[in-house]
Curated annotation (Swiss-Prot):
It comes from Haloarcula marismortui (strain ATCC 43049 / DSM 3752 / JCM 8966 / VKM B-1809) (Halobacterium marismortui). This is Phosphonates import ATP-binding protein PhnC 2. It is found in: Cell membrane. The gene is phnC2. Its main location: membrane. It catalyses: phosphonate(out) + ATP + H2O = phosphonate(in) + ADP + phosphate + H(+).
């Protein structure tokens, strides 16, 4: 179970991007985070694994409190949190298979990680996941040769090969066309149910949230103003979520696509 308790994010300027956010996620629940641009959605998702450092509150995954962990312990817990990025965060010069296997780098010794010497079980599982995300036949293609939908599937496969306890997806469909967006959401739904893990998805497209999520959390100006099933997201609830214009986080919230180099990808895998 993931527990977020009274989470706060205050920037150096004194502006508050998250204001006492609390919720729990468990089982194979798919939770969509919606809200206007700058409401704090990316800040929230990225605070869970401390890509963005919260300034108050508590985050725990099962029996491990994530907030306050030192560097080595944080690396360990990040292995249990698969991250899927808006801008894919692939290493462009590497092949599809190499990008997927990078999700296992944190489990290797320093020497084996440097040489990318993966055990046979990791390679077998990578091939299995290739089939699962419909990337058979392109495993030897470089990442920069792929379409947007294929690139996001590689990102999903890289997260899944970690065997995480939870998946965090930061706007996974924002760079995709409508049909491909639905394919990606369907794939994430299948993964949640088949692997029995929860997924938290920051998403702009309300219709996708309604169609694919089990629960929707609506953020407005850094606060939860809706938390319930899609069927309860009536027009009044939508008006409450989207009532404002530009918020603090529009000016301060970092883009989910800012960390794109190989070191950040490897760090995110837990190495």
């Amino acid at each position: 179970m993931l527990t977020v308790d009274n989470l706060e994010k205050t920037y150096d300027s004194g502006d508050r991007a998250l204001k006492g956010v609390s919720f729990e996620v468990s089982g194979n629940e798919i939770v969509a985070i919606i809200g206007p641009s700058g409401a704090g959605k990316s800040t929230l998702v990225r605070s869970i694994n401390r890509l963005t450092e919260p300034t108050g509150g508590r985050i725990s995954l099962d029996d491990t409190e994530v907030t306050g962990l030192e560097k080595s312990a944080l690396r360990d817990v990040r292995r249990d949190m698969g991250m899927i990025f808006q801008e894919f965060n692939l290493v462009e010069r590497l092949t599809v298979m190499e990008n997927i296997l990078s999700g296992r780098l944190g489990y290797l010794s320093t020497w084996n990680a440097f040489r990318r010497n993966f055990p046979p079980e990791d390679i077998r599982r990578a091939r299995e996941i290739l089939s699962r995300v419909n990337l058979e036949g392109v495993e030897n293609n470089r990442a920069d040769e792929l379409s947007g939908g294929q690139r996001q599937r590689v990102g999903i496969a890289r997260a899944v090969i970690q065997r995480p306890k939870i998946l965090l997806a930061d706007e996974p469909t924002s760079a995709l066309d409508p049909d491909t967006s639905r394919e990606v959401m369907s794939l994430l739904t299948d993964i949640a149910h088949e692997d029995d893990i929860p997924i938290i998805i920051n998403i702009h497209e309300v219709d996708l949230a309604v169609d694919y999520a089990d629960r929707i959390i609506g953020l407005s100006d850094g606060e939860i103003v809706f938390n319930g099933p899609p069927d309860d997201l009536d027009q009044a609830a939508r008006d409450e979520i989207y009532r404002g214009g530009e918020s603090i986080a529009d000016r301060e919230e970092p883009s989910a696509g800012n960390s794109t180099d190989a070191d950040d990808v490897i760090a995110e895998r837990g190495d």
